[in-house]
């Protein structure tokens, strides 16, 4: 499996904390790259380890916008995992859990992140067969 090599990469980052910038943009970028790769490969069972690393980053004393980006990333990767494994009800519940601390602050996020959040939401509702604009799609 690919995951042990990726876990070793993250361990390397974590063992060299003195080299990580504040905020740790390269570390965040590495985690997101790994999660993107796991998503594309359909290795959803490998994602929780790396999502937990994102959660640990939330404990840092960083700018509000940076922490919000981390929060959005956690949501996106959890959400895509649930949607792509057919766990639509759990994905819908997750959306509700993030309403106050993510979606109500969506204007503070980068445009690219906002678009990803809206796209994931649209895909979820299409998979739930909720009509959006009169269209229905089966997932």
Regions found by a protein language model. Give the residues of each.
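Alpha-solenoid helical-repeat scaffolds
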Residues: 1-29, 33-50
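Residues that mark the junctions of alpha-helical repeat units in TPR/alpha-solenoid scaffolds
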Residues: 2, 20-23, 27, 64-67, ...
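TPR-repeat structural position
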Residues: 2, 44, 88, 131-132
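Amphipathic alpha-helical segments of tetratricopeptide repeats
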Residues: 6-19, 51-63, 92-107, 138-139
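"A position-specific structural signal for the A-helix of alpha-solenoid helical repeats
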Residues: 26-36, 70-80, 84, 113, ...
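Large, well-folded core regions of big proteins
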Residues: 38-39, 43, 47-50, 54-60, ...
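C-terminal structural cap/anchor segments
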Residues: 129-139
């Amino acid at each position: 499996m690919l995951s042990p090599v990726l876990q070793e990469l993250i361990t390397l980052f974590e063992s060299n904390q003195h080299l990580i910038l504040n905020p740790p943009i390269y570390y965040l970028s590495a985690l997101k790259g790994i999660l993107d790769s796991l998503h594309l490969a359909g290795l959803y069972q490998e994602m929780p380890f790396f999502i937990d690393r994102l959660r640990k980053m939330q404990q840092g004393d960083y700018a509000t916008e940076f922490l919000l980006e981390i929060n959005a990333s956690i949501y996106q990767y959890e959400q895509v995992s649930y949607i792509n494994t057919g766990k639509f009800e759990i994905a819908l519940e997750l959306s509700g859990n993030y309403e106050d601390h993510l979606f109500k602050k969506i204007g503070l996020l980068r445009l690219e992140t906002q678009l990803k959040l809206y796209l994931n939401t649209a895909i979820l509702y299409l998979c739930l067969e909720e009509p959006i604009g009169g269209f229905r799609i089966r997932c």
